[in-house]
Amino acid sequence: MWVGERITEKGIGNGISIVLVINIISRLPQDLSNLFEQFVFGKAPATAILAVVIIFAIIIAMVVLVIILNDGVRKIPVQYAKKMQGRKMVGGQTSNIPLKVNTSGVIPIIFAQSIMQFPIIICSFIGYNGTGVWAEILKGLNSGYWCKPSQPIYSLGLLLYIVLIVFFAYFYTSITFNPLMIADNMKKQGGFIPGIRPGKPTSDYLNKILNYIVFIGAIGLIIVSVIPYFFNGVFGASVSFGGTSLIIIV
């Protein structure tokens, strides 16, 4: 924290973010080493080359997806009616309401992970490993057991994780973006969306578009966050570099 604050004070950038990025990037060489050791080294030349191509293709695809999530915007056109102020005609301007594809950022993933890990942390703190059904529930909440072909039942925890991501994507967006307030402000300022009546119809229209965009963003977050678990579970890879890390870096 202290180092991050000093970086911010010197004007280099957001200190905390820079520290997080450095910490995340420092794990990349080890993750790549683990992947190459498992899928490339000791394999036939053709198999090794194919593995390298697939690994880097997946990495590039994830980076592109995260960039789209972070920078993708749906612009809703807004037009302002002309009106007389004194002897001058004012208004008639055009603007837009930018709706980001990933309105909630990395928050849904962080909240979902925190909720999934909370029971495990509490049990670990009190020294309780669980017995019977509770032990199975704890395994289902542990991402280390997800996507394993030999233990498919524990992947139900992954389904819960996905549901939580979708829930928090909508929940966080509903807190930070209020279509009704925006529609009221537009109406007061003489603004309107072409083809949509001011007031509640505008609010309903914005809410409809927002729900669609949030769903797309949530699907993107799910893909980015689940891929590392899939590789770790199905192929036994040791990848600590997750979707959260990639979103923070980009």
Q: Where do the PLM segments sit?
A:
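N-terminal cationic and glycine-rich segments that engage phosphates or anionic surfaces
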Residues: 1-250
